[in-house]
């Protein structure tokens, strides 16, 4: 990165410690004076027209908050890595398209959340709803941000013409799971719905959310990462006890948006179960 410092319009921000993704990204966003900000992982590679396609999509509708790239596996370029993220009724945050053929994703569409690994965000809406939550050291911070935008009445969309190639997990060494990722998941899986669902939704969704969390807890313990998971869980409860959840106040005008999110998360159980029970089991592409 230092080799770029002599280039025009380039600013390098160096931190003396590992601050986590959210804190570091917020530093850059705070410096930005443009209409949009773009995030791009250090383990990703963009097509030449990637940025132009993101800008074209965002310019078409002022209600669009985030534009998601079509992220493709770097070493298996016929397969997608991420075509947008979603949250289920049980609180699972998942990728769309992981391991499926890129040819399936050709149309622009609204998505629940944009992956922050390669996405464009409208700066004015960031200023309104706030940046990335720095309590999410890594993982789910982009889902939290997109969910807040949904709750405020804005949209996130997939732009399949904006293609990039991603070496998944290169930054953390976690293509699937490790202790670090397990700890982050244990904490952020609790914070994500508590931050973004109003009280009535949390009451209505208590049983599926509790069941989902117990299933996750069982899975991580079975895979040998129970200690890390439990550590993350205790961190979440410590934040709640300290009153540092950062939950946005309920606004009556946002009620239609909350209802839409509730219905969307219920519906998202369909693609989630289809992927887990059919696509993965039979190795369909």
Per-region residue spans from a language model:
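Glycine-rich, basic loop-to-helix element that forms the pyrophosphate-binding segment
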Residues: 14-32, 42
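Short aromatic/hydrophobic "clamp" motif used to bind/position activated sugar donors
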Residues: 37
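A recurrent flexible, glycine/aromatic-enriched loop bordering the glycosyltransferase active site
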Residues: 80, 92-93, 100-124, 143-145, ...
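Catalytic core of nucleotide-sugar-dependent glycosyltransferases
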Residues: 162, 175-202, 223-243
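Conserved donor NDP-sugar-binding/catalytic core segment of glycosyltransferases
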Residues: 44-87
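A short, conserved alpha-helix in the catalytic core of glycosyltransferases
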Residues: 54, 112-163
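Non-catalytic, C-terminal membrane-associated alpha-helical segments of glycosyltransferases
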Residues: 202-285
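Acidic donor-binding segment of Leloir-type glycosyltransferases
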Residues: 1-17
């Amino acid at each position: 990165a230092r080799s770029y410092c002599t280039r025009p319009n380039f600013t390098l921000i160096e931190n003396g410690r590992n601050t986590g993704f959210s804190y570091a990204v917020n530093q850059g966003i705070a410096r930005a004076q443009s209409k949009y900000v773009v995030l791009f992982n250090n383990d990703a590679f963009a097509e030449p027209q990637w940025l132009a396609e993101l800008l074209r999509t965002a310019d078409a509708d002022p209600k669009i908050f985030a534009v998601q790239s079509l992220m493709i596996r770097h070493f298996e370029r016929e397969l997608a890595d991420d075509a947008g993220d979603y949250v289920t009724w049980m609180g699972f945050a998942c990728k769309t398209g992981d391991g499926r053929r890129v040819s399936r994703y050709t149309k622009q569409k609204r998505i629940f959340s944009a992956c922050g690994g390669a996405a464009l965000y409208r700066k004015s809406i960031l200023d309104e709803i706030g940046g990335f939550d720095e309590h999410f050291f890594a993982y789910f911070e982009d889902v939290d941000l997109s969910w807040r935008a949904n709750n405020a009445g804005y949209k996130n969309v997939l732009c399949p013409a904006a293609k990039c190639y991603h070496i998944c997990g290169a930054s953390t060494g976690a293509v699937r799971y490790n202790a670090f990722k397990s700890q982050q998941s244990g904490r952020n899986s609790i914070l994500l719905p508590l931050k973004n669902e109003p009280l009535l939704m949390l009451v209505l969704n208590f049983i599926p959310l509790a069941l989902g969390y117990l299933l996750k807890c069982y899975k991580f313990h079975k895979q040998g990462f129970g200690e890390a998971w439990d550590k993350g869980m205790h961190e979440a409860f410590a934040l709640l006890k300290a009153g540092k959840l950062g939950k946005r106040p309920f606004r009556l005008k946002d009620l239609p948006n909350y209802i839409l999110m509730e219905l969307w998360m219920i519906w998202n159980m369909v693609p989630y179960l289809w992927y887990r029970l059919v696509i993965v089991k039979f190795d369909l592409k």
